[in-house]
Amino acid sequence: IVEISTDLDLFKKPIYQFDCIESLQLLKTLTTSYNFNENDGKIIGEHQGAHYYTIGQRKGLAIGGYKLPLFILSTNTQTNTIYVGQGENHGSLNRPGLFIPKNDIHWLRNDLELNIGEKVVYQCRIRYRQKLENVCLYMQEDGLHLIFENLQKAITPGQFATWYKNDELKIGLV
């Protein structure tokens, strides 16, 4: 288990507020995953396998002695490494958006499919029973950018993202 410090330059980037006219280059920068390695933090413990943990998880780490609780920020099952940070407001735990590759999008109706370059505002949730959040969707050739009005905690690969307009489910994907 590797702790990631909030003192890294990575977490000193400004948090941007979005409307539907922000540049697509900025979107690609903010929805890119960051790679961590052991040089970014320090080894603080051992675990039984990175595949047993999920982003945002707090319980089950069996590591204490920190001012704030530790949360899982990222896992790497190839190297069996878990990256953690202190506090639920850690810079890597809360994200303004996400990117969904084109092959992972599953449109419920073909007439709702967005064209390349098209953008639309819906309400979205990324976990069961989460309140609906305003989101701006930008369709690009390689996939879909979702930029939320509010930061989203622990966006995790494999989650559902569903969006709605007027309480009607428009799109769902994994």
Residue ranges, per PLM feature:
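AMP-forming adenylation/ATP pyrophosphatase catalytic core
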Residues: 1-174
